[in-house]
């Protein structure tokens, strides 16, 4: 068993870390305060190959593996969680599903612009009445000649305001309740209309929006087979959760870095905070849990990269990493004391950003269901 990263993985990690420290971290606080989407960052990431890390080179990507991709997500999220999730949705939830389930023509048409960062991707599954119960969606796609007429509304769609390509799910068979009648479609920005942006607790450098769709699309916009959209969605989430787990690790690592530096500098009771046993214990626990979460993430990413079933491992990584990030960002605030509760230091932002990792791409409660059903043999793990 080799715990060392490959030279290529280390190189990609270093590129992402250097860019994040130079181009993202110095501005993250400003983006958060101003609720600004830093559109200028994504073409720069694309120039480095970081918008299509694990996309084959012949389709415009860097040709690296999924482990390299989660390493990139951790580094980006360490600097700014909003940038991290934008890249995560773009890659895990849009580009890779098209790569996995699309025809040769669909891959050639849609993947290169995504991998080159010419357009951003958005994943449109959630609806007002279909959150964790994704099989209850009401958006419909009805046959219209040789195409489809898609009509409905979506809720909480990350990056919708800025996306050019949407992976959208609609019901093609209204006689089939639950997930059986759901299909997946690849749409362009012209097919949807963003109606409002959410005001959120965190992730203020990205947008989360409601949208409506009322458009006719050609038949070649159907991804995979009719009625197989729920399978596409679940396989997408199985991989996407690994990316969100990496995001959570990045946020927690940033909080630890800040708390450690503060403890080494701040003096109380005649000594540095770092010399107080209570603070040492907090930092030790933070480091321990971050390392444990990172190992779970890398195991899940390795299994996906090698084509092994990874639903259970991805759920474990996301569950542990997200809850760990919420705990440890709170501990970072505690180490800072009153200063941690102010906007003067970034730890309050890390705390706000961490919370969502327990909710999107499957809540902690859903992750526990996925894990339980897997260990009890009640769920077949898709490979994709």
Positions of PLM-derived features:
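Structural signature of FAD isoalloxazine-binding scaffolds in flavoprotein oxidoreductases
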Residues: 63-73, 133-137, 215-217
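A short core secondary-structure module
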Residues: 151-194
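A short, Trp-centered hydrophobic/proline-enriched beta-strand micro-motif
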Residues: 117-125
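A short, charged helix-loop
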Residues: 209-235
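Flexible, small-/acidic-enriched active-site or ligand-binding loops
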Residues: 136, 190-218
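Alpha-helical interface subdomain recognition
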Residues: 1-79, 83-89, 101-106, 113-117, ...
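Short glycine/proline-enriched turns and hinge-like loops at secondary-structure junctions
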Residues: 64-65, 133-135, 159-164, 178-181, ...
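Short Gly/Pro-enriched turn/cap motifs at secondary-structure boundaries
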Residues: 114, 129-132, 156-159, 175-176, ...
